[in-house]
């Protein structure tokens, strides 16, 4: 007996490379979210990104203020913290796109 229709994805968000992420954020309706610390954000970030530190105690409260009807494109330094943030937001019903290589990969790619 087959169990077709039960092929859930292992994650509720998409993880993409730099080129795909650049295409996603070219849409001005997409919210760009940097989940690094304020200090890291101040040292450089993707243009137009807002900063909500995923490790802060108020991440869930602040992230809940994001518009629920818009895609959230998020990143951290290298792709670890962003997975945590993406899972939290996806569980809250947001459509989330995560940059696999983080800001380091973004800058290495010359973006």
Where are these regions (language model features)?
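Structural scaffold elements adjacent to functional motifs in cytosolic proteins
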Residues: 32-34
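Rhodanese-like catalytic fold shared by cysteine-dependent sulfurtransferases
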Residues: 1-24, 30, 39-71, 77-111
